[in-house]
């Protein structure tokens, strides 16, 4: 969602139009509806803190390693979110991931 909204903005597309187009199809979800609107309005109030999201991803990464799995997408998401915590975004909601792309 964050990548799609970043792309839309870079191409001069309206984020609300994008969300409306994808939300009614297979890509739609409650998370998209809820977090997408918050991102577009700049509402980063936490429903779930970024710092807790990273903690949970670290637990998942540890369990994956214990199982002998290499979960590249998890590792990339964890790295991206950790960089936001390093920038002081740990107390924001996980929708603040958009800030990673707004560097």
Language model features by range: what are they?
Residues 9-16, 68, 72-73:
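Structural helix-adjacent loops and short alpha-helical linkers that scaffold large soluble proteins
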Residues 28-89, 93, 100-103:
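Interdomain hinge/lid region at the active-site interface
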Residues 7-13, 87-92:
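Short, exposed beta-strand "edge-strand" segments with a Pro/Gly-rich flavor and a Y/T-containing core
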Residues 1-11, 22-34, 52-54:
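Active-site-proximal catalytic alpha-helix in oxidoreductases
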Residues 14-24, 75-79:
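Beta-strand segments within the central parallel beta-sheet cores of soluble alpha/beta enzyme folds
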């Amino acid at each position: 969602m964050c990548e799609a909204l970043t792309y839309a903005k870079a191409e001069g597309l309206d984020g609300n139009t994008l969300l409306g187009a994808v939300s009614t199809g297979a890509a739609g979800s409650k998370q998209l509806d809820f977090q997408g609107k918050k991102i577009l309005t700049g509402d980063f109030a936490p429903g779930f803190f970024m710092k807790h999201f990273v903690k949970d991803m670290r637990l998942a990464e540890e369990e994956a390693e214990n199982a002998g799995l290499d979960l590249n997408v998890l590792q990339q998401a964890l790295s991206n979110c950790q960089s936001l915590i390093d920038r002081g975004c740990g107390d924001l909601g996980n929708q603040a991931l958009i800030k990673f792309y707004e560097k």
